[in-house]
């Protein structure tokens, strides 16, 4: 589990992905949709909450996701 502090001061926890998470997002054709849904699944953030993130904060979550996948 990793914690990321957003610019709003909110701390978001992201759990490590499991094979089941990859199976769920494999149904999406678009890579952006895959990533958005995977981040949502791992953090518990809703699609609306993710849509309202600044690009800087979203980038922090992308970086955390990448660290799990590499």
Label every PLM stretch briefly.
Residues 1-70:
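Short, surface-exposed, charged amphipathic helix/loop patches that serve as local interaction elements
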């Amino acid at each position: 589990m990793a914690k990321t502090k957003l610019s709003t001061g909110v701390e978001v926890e992201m759990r490590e992905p499991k094979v089941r998470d990859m199976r769920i997002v494999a149904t999406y054709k678009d890579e952006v949709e895959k990533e958005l849904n995977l981040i949502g699944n791992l953090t518990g953030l809703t699609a609306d909450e993710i849509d309202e993130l600044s690009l800087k904060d979203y980038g922090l979550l992308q970086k955390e996701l990448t660290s799990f996948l590499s």
